[in-house]
C-alpha cells in the first residue's frame, strides 16, 4: 500500500443525455433532510464524470442510489492535475418521487488502498410528464468534494461539499 494522501479532491458531474444537457438543483431550506435537492428525470441516461486529485488514485465504479455505474479511465487533464473517469447512470425503472417528498440516495465510490468515499444526495425524480420541473432551479456543472482518508483506510471524511 502506498502513502495515504492528506487530502483527496474529487468532483462529480452529471449531464443528461443525449445532448449533454445540464442538471438542476433547488434550494429547499430546512424543509427536508438537506437544503439542496438534485432534480433527475426517470427513464433517462446521465453521463457521470469523476475527476480526482491526486492522480495516483484508482476507482472502478460509483454507486448512485444502489445503481453501480462502472467507471472507465478517460484521461489525465492536460496539466496533469487530475485524473478523469466517465460512466453512464441510467434512471430507467426508478419510481418518480411523490409530490412534496424528497429521496435521500447514497453515493459511494470505493478507492483502491485508501477507503470508500460516501455521501448522501437529496434527489427528486420526475417522470416524463413533469420533465419541465427538472429545469426549474439552478443548473450546476459539478459537485466538488474535499475529503480526508482515515487512518484505517476504510472511509474518507468529507470536509467540504460545493455545488458549482
From Swiss-Prot:
Entry's family note: Belongs to the CNRIP family.
Organism (species): Bos taurus
UniProt-recorded name of the protein: CB1 cannabinoid receptor-interacting protein 1
Functional summary from the UniProt entry: Suppresses cannabinoid receptor CNR1-mediated tonic inhibition of voltage-gated calcium channels.
A GO molecular function held by the record: type 1 cannabinoid receptor binding
Domain of life: Eukaryota
Pfam families hit by this protein: CNRIP1
GO cellular component: plasma membrane
Subunit structure: Interacts with the cannabinoid receptor CNR1 (via C-terminus). Does not interact with cannabinoid receptor CNR2.
Amino acid at each position: 500500500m502506498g502513502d495515504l494522501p492528506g487530502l483527496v479532491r474529487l468532483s462529480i458531474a452529471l449531464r443528461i443525455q443525449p445532448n449533454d444537457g445540464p442538471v438542476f438543483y433547488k434550494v429547499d431550506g430546512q424543509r427536508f433532510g438537506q437544503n439542496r435537492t438534485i432534480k433527475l428525470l426517470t427513464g433517462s441516461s446521465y453521463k457521470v464524470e469523476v475527476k480526482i486529485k491526486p492522480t495516483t488514485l484508482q476507482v472502478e465504479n460509483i454507486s448512485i442510489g444502489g445503481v453501480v455505474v462502472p467507471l472507465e479511465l478517460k484521461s489525465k487533464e492536460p496539466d496533469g492535475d487530475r485524473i478523469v473517469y466517465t460512466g453512464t447512470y441510467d434512471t430507467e425503472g426508478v419510481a418518480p418521487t411523490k409530490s412534496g417528498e424528497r429521496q435521500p440516495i447514497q453515493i459511494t465510490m470505493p478507492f483502491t488502498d485508501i477507503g470508500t468515499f460516501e455521501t448522501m444526495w437529496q434527489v427528486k425524480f420526475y417522470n416524463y410528464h413533469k420533465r419541465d420541473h427538472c429545469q426549474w432551479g439552478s443548473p450546476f456543472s459539478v459537485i466538488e468534494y474535499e475529503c480526508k482518508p482515515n487512518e484505517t483506510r476504510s472511509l474518507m471524511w468529507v470536509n467540504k461539499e460545493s455545488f458549482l
